[in-house]
């Protein structure tokens, strides 16, 4: 799994331009369009990710280590 430190800083901003705390960062594969990624993943965040209970479950969602999108993690801190 890619470490938070490897994510470009500009991807660690919320919609209010607040820096997301590292323990609230979820790593996801990005698609070609950043905005499309945000839109497509927002619904997934509130549905699938709420079901995840352990950090190791997130590894199955990471299909590539070349480009990643950081979004807010709405679950509990698993660190």
Curated annotation (Swiss-Prot):
Domain of life: Eukaryota
Protein name (record): CATR tumorigenic conversion 1 protein
Gene field: CATR1
């Amino acid at each position: 799994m890619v470490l938070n430190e490897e994510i470009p800083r500009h991807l660690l901003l919320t919609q209010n331009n607040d820096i997301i705390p590292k323990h609230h960062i979820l790593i996801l594969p990005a698609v070609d369009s950043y905005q499309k990624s945000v839109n497509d993943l927002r619904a997934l965040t509130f549905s699938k990710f709420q079901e995840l209970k352990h950090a190791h479950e997130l590894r199955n969602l990471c299909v590539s280590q070349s480009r990643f999108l950081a979004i807010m993690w709405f679950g509990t801190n698993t660190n």
